[in-house]
Amino acid sequence: DSAEILLPPTNSIELAKKLLEDLPTGGKTPMVHGLITAYQLTKSYLRKDSQSLPIMVIISDCRPNVPWQETPYYDYRYNEVGYPKVIEEVLSMAQFIQSEGQIKSLVIEVDERYDHMSKGRDIAEAMGAQYFRIQDLKAKGIIRLLRSR
């Protein structure tokens, strides 16, 4: 499993808005892969333009269920051993991103359910990021939020 970049670095708020409206949902959540991919992309961008002030926007159901490396556990969401390991990997990567100090972040949780499986707040806290739930924002609200950064 791997992460997919839906929006490469851009200054175009309009492009971001269009992509947000067509955001696919469902399936597995390889969150640690997503954080690593976003971090690498952002660092690469900073090497090209050290004066820029990028904002890493993580839009996810924030229910990580795919480990960094495959293990023998079948369903990571409900496995007593595998699931805590997945969460530990995600939070460790989030803390690493925060420790770098160069990258501002936002975490937007798109799953409307909020229970013990919801890790958006924990991920945002570990990243030093602002946290939002999608039902509290609409596309226009997200765009306003990004413009205010």
Kindly give the residue locations of the regions a language model identified.
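Amphipathic alpha-helical segments in well-structured domains
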Residues: I13, K17, L35, I87-V90
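Phosphate/oxyanion-binding active-site loops and adjacent basic polyanion-contact surfaces
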Residues: G27-L35
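Von Willebrand factor type A / integrin I
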Residues: T42, Y73-R149
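Short helix-terminating capping/connector loops at secondary-structure junctions
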Residues: K48-L53
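Active-site metal-binding loops of divalent metal-dependent hydrolases
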Residues: C62
